[in-house]
C-alpha cells in the first residue's frame, strides 16, 4: 500500500540523498548504518523500552528508505546494492522480532508465525517476479506497513498488539500475492 505513495516522496528523499552524497556516505554504508540502528532498537525492545525502541526503529527505517535515493543521487545503483538492501531488511525484521520476543513482550510462537509470514511476503514476491509475473508490489502489509505498525504500537506501549496485527496482515498479504502470482503466471 505504501508503494502507492512512493512516487510522491521520491523527490524529497532524493534531495536528502544528494545531501548525504555530499558528505561522502555511500548507499551500502547507509544500509549498514540503518541496520546497526535497527539492532539498537531490537536491544531496546529486549529491555522493554517500547517507546524508545519504536523511535529508534523509525530512524533506522528512515535510513533504510534513503539508501536507494542515495544510490540514484550518486549514480551508484547496483545489483549488489539491491541484494544487500533486501538481505539486510530480512535481518532487520528478524532482529526486531527477536528483541521483542526475548524481552517477553510477545510469545515465541506468535513471533515465529509473524516472522515466517513477513518472510513469505518477501519471498513470494521474489519468486513470482523471477518466474515472470512482473512487479508484484501488492498486498495490504508490505515491509513499510509492517514497520509502521510496530512503530505506532511501540509509541503506545502496545507492541504485542502490533505484532499480532503484523502477523495477521502478513499472512493475508502472502495469500494475496500467491493469488495474484497464480493469475499472472497462468495468463503468460
Swiss-Prot record:
It catalyses: CDP-2,3-bis-O-(phytanyl)-sn-glycerol + 1D-myo-inositol 3-phosphate = saturated 1-archaetidyl-1D-myo-inositol 3-phosphate + CMP + H(+). It is found in: Cell membrane. Coiled coil: none annotated. Binds 2 Mg(2+) or Mn(2+) ions per subunit. Pathway: Lipid metabolism; phospholipid metabolism. Mg(2+) 1 binds at residues 64, 67, 85. The keyword Cell membrane applies. Its cofactor is Mn(2+); Mg(2+). GO terms for biological process: phospholipid biosynthetic process. The keyword Manganese applies. Keywords: Cell membrane, Lipid biosynthesis, Lipid metabolism, Magnesium, Manganese, Membrane, Metal-binding, Phospholipid metabolism, Transferase, Transmembrane, Transmembrane helix. InterPro entries: AIP_synthase, archin_ph_syn, CDP-OH_P_trans, CDP-OH_PTrfase_TM_dom, CDP_ALCOHOL_P_TRANSF_CS. Its EC number is 2.7.8.39. It is a multi-pass membrane protein. Disulfide bonds: none annotated. Signal peptide: none annotated. The active site is at 89 (proton acceptor). GO terms for cellular component: plasma membrane. It is an enzyme of class 2 (transferase). Mg(2+) 2 binds at residues 64, 85, 89. One of its GO terms (molecular function) is phosphotransferase activity, for other substituted phosphate groups. NCBIfam families: archin_ph_syn (NF040950). HAMAP family: AIP_synthase. Catalyzes the formation of archaetidylinositol phosphate (AIP) from CDP-archaeol (CDP-ArOH or CDP-2,3-bis-(O-phytanyl)-sn-glycerol) and 1L-myo-inositol 1-phosphate (IP or 1D-myo-inositol 3-phosphate). AIP is a precursor of archaetidyl-myo-inositol (AI), an ether-type inositol phospholipid ubiquitously distributed in archaea membranes and essential for glycolipid biosynthesis in archaea. Belongs to the CDP-alcohol phosphatidyltransferase class-I family. This is Archaetidylinositol phosphate synthase. It comes from Pyrococcus horikoshii (strain ATCC 700860 / DSM 12428 / JCM 9974 / NBRC 100139 / OT-3).
